[in-house]
Amino acid sequence: MSDHDDVIVMLCTAPSLAVAEALAHSAVSARVAACVNLIDGVRSVYRWEGAVCNELEVQLVFKTTRERAEALRELTARENAHEVPELLSLPVDHG
């Protein structure tokens, strides 16, 4: 990950620390992320199936590249416990 233009941060949440740790280990082991930060105790408020939900979750912050983003999307879709996992991609300007 030497070219900063290629580096991105991808964010998703997991319903528990166990699920988040498993996702982080899978992503790093599969080399689709260089590093993953886990932020436990994130509260998410969202609408799902007509109801407003208020849940504690774990925020995952993946450091990866544009080249590996699709493989990371596939991994999180396959291994996240959420029915529709969120995965946001953000460019890195400096770091």
Predicted regions and their residues:
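Positively charged, small/polar-rich N-terminal and surface patches that mediate targeting and assembly
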Residues: 1-95
